[in-house]
Amino acid sequence: MGVVRVQHETKMENQSWLKKLARRLGPGHIVNLCFIVVLLFSTLLTWREVVVLEDAYISSQRNHLENVANALDKHLQYNVDKLIFLRNGMREALVAPLDFTSLRNAVTEFEQHRDEHAWQIELNRRRTLPVNGVSDALVSEGNLLSRENESLDNEITAALEVGYLLRLAHNSSSMVEQAVYVSRAGFYVSTLPTLFTRNVPTRYYGYVTQPWFIGHSQRENRHRAVRWFTSQPEHASNTEPQVTVSVPVDSNNYWYGVLGMSIPVRTMQQFLRNAIDKNLDGEYQLYDSKLRFLTSSNPDHPTGNIFDPRELALLAQAMEHDTRGGIRMDSRYVSWERLDHFDGVLVRVHTLSEGVRGDFGSISIALTLLWALFTSMLLLSWYVIRRMVSNMYVLQSSLQWQAWHDTLTRLYNRGALFEKACPLAKLCHTHQHPFSVIQVDLDHFKAINDRFGHQAGDRVLSHAAGLISSSLRAQDIAGRVGGEEFCVILPGANLTQAAEVAERIRLKLNEKEMLIAKSTTIRISASLGVSSSEETGDYDFEQLQSLADRRLYLAKQAGRNRVFASDNA
């Protein structure tokens, strides 16, 4: 309890210090300080304009980049969603294959041709895609390949079902050039037809040696998540670069194969060009996760990379800490944003010459005129505002003091005391601190008024108020709530501590005689009632005051000039 009291007293002292500081720094000083700050900042006008313009410029660059990145991301997300849909369909077909005669015949046909060097199973060329495969002997030569699974027949029928879905999902408006399912059991289904059966082994081994297939082994892809891979063409090769999104197909902890979709870089380049506002400057570049250049929106530099190794290193360092951002490189501003559904980053490059031709010159002039107008108005109005604020503050302070205080005793009046007490009670309740109330009533005050007059009574009230105030702690609050009644609020004080304060008040009032007329002195006394929230857990100020008032009258009935802190004391 001692620690709680110390903490509470420290908090009260801090609040008192803040109030003193607020009184010392009156509105007049604050107005002067504001104008001084304005004058100081006027010397930094040019710098401030640069900062404002730079923030607006960076926001503009990021917004343009975000629009293009979102458009590209949505298109890529559509392809990823299709891939997940195909995987779910494949899993369902592996667990519960359709019991069609044509599918059973396909399994029989596989058993008949599985030893052949190359084979092809086709149900209906118009509705589904053929399954192309190689022999058992060729499968046994691959480290990742195997036909040793109990659900091989189900996988054959599932591949035919997925072939039907692949044909439906593949369309010319999509960026995807090829969608394929490659099985570890030596066969594949692809939207790109294999015209000659003799080409099946070459094409199959081309698939299973690709990073997008090998990278989905259970060791390489433990989380069995979607992955993106980039393939760069070799020198003297006619193939074009492309990115492949792929996902493993597993069932019952067995890896069956990989579903993949290949997107040529040229289609992504065309998409970037179509997504960009023709009225905007700047070049967009797409990079993979290793910051290898893929494509650009600039038709004049379709395969160029405008960053040297040092700049790429700076860009990579900046990307380590956030998913989006910007960096200034010489006369260029480079903004970047990682894509959600592609393992790569979209970069926007804006040069200084492009920025000069933009709208920021007009913005600079507008900001300058606005600042000049605002400063002129401040300087012209300063004197009038300063005088008005000073006069209003003096008047407000006087009216506020009169509204909150009793002019005779200079203590809080009843309304102000209640306004102060309720928030303090709520604060003590919140922090589980005790909250106590002392009710004070001067004994035989009416007799003093009747015998010595109202002026003497006023002097007694003023004298008693001074003694009560001098008996309190710094955080305590006292107020006059009636004719000769006073109320003291003690936040953080328990019943015992409040009773000690009440006894101190009683002794001070009773031990000093006061002069009320020429050669006439009297000794006054008071009856006091004490209540505390720790008795019943009730922090309602009015209830506590009522309880203290009841105990006050118990003290009067017991003979006056005493303190009652309980109903039995």
UniProtKB/Swiss-Prot annotation:
Catalysed reaction equations from the record: 2 GTP = 3',3'-c-di-GMP + 2 diphosphate
Entry keywords, A to Z: Cell inner membrane, Cell membrane, Cellulose biosynthesis, GTP-binding, Magnesium, Membrane, Metal-binding, Nucleotide-binding, Transferase, Transmembrane, Transmembrane helix
Locations listed in the record: Cell inner membrane
Source domain of life: Bacteria
Residue span(s) of domain GGDEF: 433-568
Active site positions, chain numbering: 484
Binding site for Mg(2+): 441, 484
Essential cofactor(s): Mg(2+)
EC number(s) per entry: 2.7.7.65
Family matches, as PROSITE patterns: GGDEF
Membrane protein topology class: Multi-pass membrane protein
Site (Transition state stabilizer): 446
Transmembrane segments: 25-45, 365-385
Residue positions binding substrate: 449, 454, 458
InterPro entries reported for this sequence: CHASE7 (IPR033416), Diguanylate_Cyclase (IPR050469), GGDEF_dom (IPR000160), Nucleotide_cyclase (IPR029787), Rev_trsase/Diguanyl_cyclase (IPR043128)
Broad class of enzyme this protein falls into: transferase
Cofactor note: Binds 1 Mg(2+) ion per monomer.
Biological process, per Gene Ontology: cell adhesion involved in single-species biofilm formation; cellulose biosynthetic process; negative regulation of bacterial-type flagellum-dependent cell motility
Pathway named in the protein's UniProt entry: Glycan metabolism; bacterial cellulose biosynthesis; Purine metabolism; 3',5'-cyclic di-GMP biosynthesis
Cysteine-cysteine disulfides: none
GO cellular component: plasma membrane
One function term, GO molecular function aspect: GTP binding
One of the Pfam families matching this protein, by short name: GGDEF
Known function: Catalyzes the synthesis of cyclic-di-GMP (c-di-GMP) via the condensation of 2 GTP molecules. Cyclic-di-GMP is a second messenger which controls cell surface-associated traits in bacteria. Involved in the regulation of cellulose production.
Assembly, per entry: Homodimer.
Identification of the protein by name: Probable diguanylate cyclase DgcQ
Lineage, broadest ranks: Bacteria, Pseudomonadati, Pseudomonadota, Gammaproteobacteria, Enterobacterales
